[in-house]
UniProtKB/Swiss-Prot annotation:
InterPro entries: Alpha/beta_knot_MTases, RNA_MeTrfase_C_dom, tRNA_m1G_MTases_N. To A.aeolicus AQ_054. It comes from the Bacteria. This is Uncharacterized protein TM_1570.
Length: 192
């Protein structure tokens, strides 16, 4: 059901270069660009997940400027896309928020640049999203990817965007746009 698709950009817990669990920094571009993609594809919400108070404060100030301040008058379409953004400390908070809105836990789609056992194709993911009545949450990682603890609670693992490439290091903004397009594409426009 395309009306219940959400995306979350995870900054904690994230794998560090050495495999340890870290928090990554939120970037202005990730907030803006993924929000614009989410709005373009009519997603129901976009979550920024960071456990760092300073990062939360920075994102909150930025959102206030673009939603309510001068930015909302200067660039109304940006303000519209940023209305989709919710800031949460942990993935559990995101799941609780979606469950409070939708009445049930979402199906979780795990994404990775790495090929994993039992991953599903984008075509299969698209079919699941269209056919399910449940809400869907697409998880995007930062740093060196989402950790196993998130993999373990996920319902599906999507195939990598370019599994066979000798260079597979897209920005999360580019990956988000490609993943969302492959899963939703023009299906949303054609449902009427």
């Amino acid at each position: 059901m395309l009306e219940k698709v959400y995306v979350a950009l995870i900054h904690y817990p994230i794998k560090g270069k050495d495999g340890s669990i870290i928090s990554t920094a939120v970037t202005n571009l990730d907030v803006h660009d993924i929000a614009r993609t989410a709005r373009t594809y009519n997603l129901k919400g976009y979550y920024i997940v960071t456990n760092l108070r300073a990062q939360q404060d920075m994102v909150s100030k930025m959102l206030k400027f673009w939603r309510e301040g001068f930015g909302s008058r200067y660039n109304p379409s940006r303000a519209e896309s940023l209305k989709l953004v919710k800031l949460k400390s942990y993935l559990e908070d995101v799941l609780e928020d979606i469950e409070s809105v939708e009445g049930e836990r979402p199906l979780i789609f795990f994404t990775s640049a790495k090929k994993r056992e039992n991953d599903i194709s984008f075509e299969e993911g698209r079919r699941i999203i269209i056919e399910t009545e449940k809400p869907v949450l697409i998880l995007l990682g930062t740093g060196w990817g989402l950790p196993d603890e998130i993999l373990e609670i996920s319902d599906y693992v999507l195939e990598p965007i370019r599994a066979q490439s000798d260079f597979n290091h897209l920005s999360v903004r580019a990956a988000a746009a490609i993943i969302i397009d492959r899963l939703i594409g023009e299906n949303y426009a054609r449902r009427d």
